[in-house]
Structure formats: structure tokens, C-alpha cells
Design a protein with these regions (language model features):
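RNase H-like (RuvC/DEDD) metal-dependent nuclease/polynucleotide-processing core
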Residues: 1-242
Length: 242
């Protein structure tokens, strides 16, 4: 897979404009597209994805937080967060988490925008076949290369060790030495950006694109049989791990 350029979006409006761009394109987006079916049922929310994201979008952030907080507190200690089927094998956080990281809020902002844009989300909802959105998760692929931390938003934690980890990840990507076995090519300046960006955002964007590229070439976008359309699936996570 070849990366030609990296654009940076600084607003939700810019993200909406990206989703509205005419196809054909496929994009990998690093936020949860769905919620755990068990939690949705317990909350009494719609069990259809389009209806679910519409319902969540109708709530204020305060209301959304309050519903998830109440649901979490009602669960047994040690099992506060429900997970989607894909979360355990992917090593991803429950999309109900509101902090560290606030992936529930990422769902709240991201998923309704996908629905409103009318893009196709394979395994989740029909839409414009020329504009395809895939749920990506850089952490899954990167952990097949190294378990070392490679990024931080805190300046004091942007260490030489993390820079070295980014270098190892980039080297492995160019060799296709990772779980998806797709080789990355990119101009030297883009590789340098990914190496120097201590937040990891540039490297994560590249990995998301690689996951989307892998899905574009895989039969059925690489989805296992029986994906729950309420929960969705993360690109590249193997069915055998479920």
C-alpha cells in the first residue's frame, strides 16, 4: 500500500466534508462504530444500528454520559463494562468507556456522522457502495509488531524510547512484517513525519489506511461470518480469535 499524502482534519465539519467526498474510496476510522448488544438491550435502546445511532445522537453529551454511568454502576464490580464480540480478540477498550480513553464519546460523535453521510459500513449498514467506511484500530496491528508504547500526548512522556518504538513499527510496516502482511511504501518525508510525531497521530493514520487497504482487497472486506450489525467489526481481527 502506498501513502501519497497526509491531510489533517481539525473539526467535525472537516470530517463530515471528508465523508461527503464522492467515491470511490474506502476509509479506515479509529473509533467504535457500534456498541455491545447486551448493553444496548439493557439500556432499552434500539436494536437496529441506524436507529441506535439516531437515538444516541438525540441525547446531549450529559444525558449520554448519565445513561452510561448508571449502566456501569448497575453492573457487578470487576465487570463494569460490557464488550463487543470483537473487543476481546482485538484488545480494544469497551466502547462504553467515558474516560481513559473516552471511546464512548468517540462513538457518539463518529457513528451518527457515518449514518448521516450515507456511507456503506460493511457488516453494519447498507449505503453508497462507492464510499465505504471500515472500523480500524491501530493498536491491534501495532501489537503484532511490538508491545512497547510508541506514543503519548504528554510532552514529558514523549521519550526517545517511544521514538525508537515508532521506528520499529515503521520498519516492520515497510517489510510487511505484521499480522496483515501488507507492505507500506511512502515518500521519505511522510515516513519522517510518522517517526517524529510523538503523539502517534501520523503513524496511527497510516496504520488505519493500511487496515482499510487490506479490507478492500480481502473477500467480504475480511469480515468473519455472522458479524453482529449492532456491534460491527474491526478490520483484520481474525475470526479464529473469537
Amino acid at each position: 500500500m502506498h501513502v501519497e499524502a497526509i491531510d489533517r482534519l481539525d473539526s467535525f465539519e472537516a470530517f463530515e466534508a471528508l465523508l461527503a467526498e464522492p467515491g470511490p474510496w474506502i476509509g479506515g476510522f479509529d473509533f467504535p462504530f457500534g456498541l455491545p448488544r447486551s448493553a444496548v438491550a439493557e439500556l432499552g435502546w434500539p436494536l437496529d444500528w441506524v436507529a441506535l445511532v439516531g437515538h444516541c445522537a438525540s441525547l446531549s453529551r450529559t444525558e449520554f454520559r448519565a445513561r452510561l454511568d448508571a449502566h456501569r454502576q448497575a453492573r457487578a464490580f470487576g465487570d463494569r463494562y460490557a464488550h463487543r464480540t470483537v473487543d476481546r480478540p482485538a484488545g480494544s477498550h469497551s466502547p462504553l468507556k467515558l474516560v481513559n480513553p473516552p471511546v464512548a464519546l468517540m462513538f457518539l460523535e463518529g457513528a451518527p456522522r457515518l449514518a448521516r453521510a450515507g456511507v456503506r459500513v460493511p457488516g453494519v449498514c447498507a449505503g453508497d457502495d462507492s464510499r465505504i467506511a471500515i472500523e480500524a484500530y491501530p493498536g491491534y496491528l501495532v501489537r503484532s509488531i511490538t508491545r512497547a508504547s510508541y506514543k503519548s500526548d504528554t510532552r514529558s512522556k514523549q521519550t526517545p524510547e517511544r521514538a525508537e518504538a515508532r521506528a520499529r513499527v515503521l520498519a516492520a510496516l515497510t517489510r510487511a512484517d505484521h499480522c496483515l502482511e501488507v507492505a507500506l511504501t511512502a515518500p521519505p518525508d511522510i515516513l519522517a513525519q510518522a517517526q517524529s510525531d510523538a503523539s502517534g497521530d501520523t503513524l496511527d493514520a497510516i496504520v488505519c489506511a493500511l487496515q482499510a487497504g487490506w479490507a478492500a482487497r480481502a473477500p467480504g472486506f475480511g469480515l468473519p461470518d455472522g458479524v453482529d450489525p449492532l456491534e460491527g467489526w474491526i478490520a483484520g481481527v481474525a475470526q479464529v480469535n473469537v
